[in-house]
Swiss-Prot record, chains A, B, C:
Cytoplasmic topological segments: 1-25
Official protein name in the record: Tumor necrosis factor ligand superfamily member 4
Subunit and interaction comment: Homotrimer.
Protein task: Cytokine that binds to TNFRSF4. Co-stimulates T-cell proliferation and cytokine production.
Residue numbers on the Extracellular membrane side: 49-199
UniProt xrefs under PANTHER family: OX40 LIGAND (PTHR17534), TUMOR NECROSIS FACTOR LIGAND SUPERFAMILY MEMBER 4 (PTHR17534:SF4)
Subcellular location field: Membrane
One CC-aspect GO term: extracellular space
Membrane topology recorded in Swiss-Prot or TrEMBL: Single-pass type II membrane protein
Annotated tissue distribution: Detected in T-cell lines, but not in a macrophage cell line.
Origin species: Rattus norvegicus
Protein family membership: Belongs to the tumor necrosis factor family.
Main location, first listed in the record: membrane
Sequence ranges assigned to domain THD in this UniProt record: 59-176
């Protein structure tokens, strides 16, 4: 019977190659240990990437809009649907959604002497815009700190001309955020009151 | 004979520890299932990363060049081999390769009254540069939208002096892109007509 | 005895399903090969990510500080603890740590005519700041190249008033780096000589 004559298969191995078989077992253990560690490393890394996926940088806030006239005492800021539009214009005011330092540039030529003030925050005095060519031309660049809820608009007055009769040539307003990645208010549905003007 | 006395090895197990053996088999299945899922997750993630490797941000387009004289009615724009050079100068024109909003800054002092115009696009009127100190000094900053194929150059004229006789002190032109990651034309081999000037 | 009647378990398989068994073995080899390759790919990718983890972009260097008076012939630059402070002010000088192109903006109103010069490097002539409103108002924007060890400060003099008696309204200095990721000196411990002023 087997018990006396025929040894179970494993026993046959052990006599002749017991150390080889042990070494093989250790090797197999080490390999699967390494494989498990490698897999664990990868899975942990992937999970970390997903959980800490870098907050998508908010796009640089910017606006480039034609300034084409005067309406209700304010310069009329048109908007043009091109890739520079990441800021909204409402009632000739540029709505600020993200905190940061902004570059504001205004240029244009008038047919009469005008005085322009740049407003951006209720409790702050406006910036009086220096003019050129006896008050008939503006090429003005300023840097200021703006924050969510600010609204940038430009009031204009001419001593002898009604606002609505003011004519402007080559008028343009550019606002660019210089320090992106500050606080940004959640985006609101784009309202329809913007002044659609072909650029 | 075996049939009566000696059972095959597996049968020996089953009687005494059949549930334990089944449980081991299920465990082994679950473990290898988890390992396979983990591996699949990692491989899919790695492939996604490779396939969607974020387009390398194009470097911010910028130029800082000395303005040292006048040539052919244009201010002579030298170029200096330093890390600010990502834009090419040809025939005293700065070649624009990437769309975006740019800050252009010009400064310098002349020995006579001059008038400078900033040109950047064929079908657009140039920007008349306001001067200081009776037209003998310029410290001018403007923001404008430039696009591929635009060329920035500065025409200068003085009522009583030939262009080539104009002398400029501390002249410098700086152009910096404020909104990188717009469209960029594929890079062309750098041509040799630029004006090499030690800064 | 076994030799004649009872074959070892493997032998039983071979006769009837030898090709099936071989095919299974090949399949198992292929699967573990794929698993090993997949695991290797992931581990190599993860290691590459760790070893080449993108140098953390240095934050855009910027300062927005109130300018509130005059001290030792220099405009007094206060500092306010808000998120715009990534630059240090010492002895009314803004310390430059990172190379790059910077936008410098100064605004303010005085009660007398003043002359202001913008200094930033020992061996460079200062920039004479153009004034408005008969020298009593400044709204000035300039772009210049600054480097580690530069110090930005503003000297001011008034023909008939002592520096310490000069009064300024709505004075503000803003400095913003336009080309981040240039060379930055290692950060030094923040010194205590800065002028703490509530903004």
């Amino acid at each position: 019977m087997e018990g006396e004559g025929v040894q179970p298969p494993d026993e046959n191995l052990e006599n002749g190659s017991r150390p080889r078989f042990k070494w093989k077992k250790v090797l197999r253990l080490v390999v699967s240990g390494i494989k498990a560690a490698g897999l664990l490393l990868c899975v942990v890394y992937v999970c970390l990437q997903f959980s800490s996926s870098p907050a998508k940088d908010s796009p640089i806030q910017r606006l480039r809009a034609p300034v084409t006239g005067c309406e209700g005492g304010r310069l009329f800021i048109g908007t043009s649907k091109n890739e520079y539009e990441t800021m909204e214009v409402q009632n000739n005011s540029v709505i600020i959604n993200c905190d940061g330092l902004y570059l504001i540039h205004l240029k244009g030529s008038f047919f009469q002497e005008v005085k322009i003030n740049l407003h951006f925050r209720k409790d702050r005095s406006p910036i009086f815009v220096p003019m050129l060519n006896n008050g008939q031309r503006v090429v003005f660049t300023v840097v200021t700190s703006l924050a969510f809820k600010d609204e940038v608009y430009l009031t204009v007055n001419a001593s002898d001309t009604l606002c609505e009769h003011l004519q402007i040539n080559d008028g343009e307003l550019i606002i660019v955020q210089l320090t992106p990645n500050g606080y940004c208010a959640p985006e609101r549905p784009y309202s329809s009151t913007v002044n659609q003007v072909p650029l």
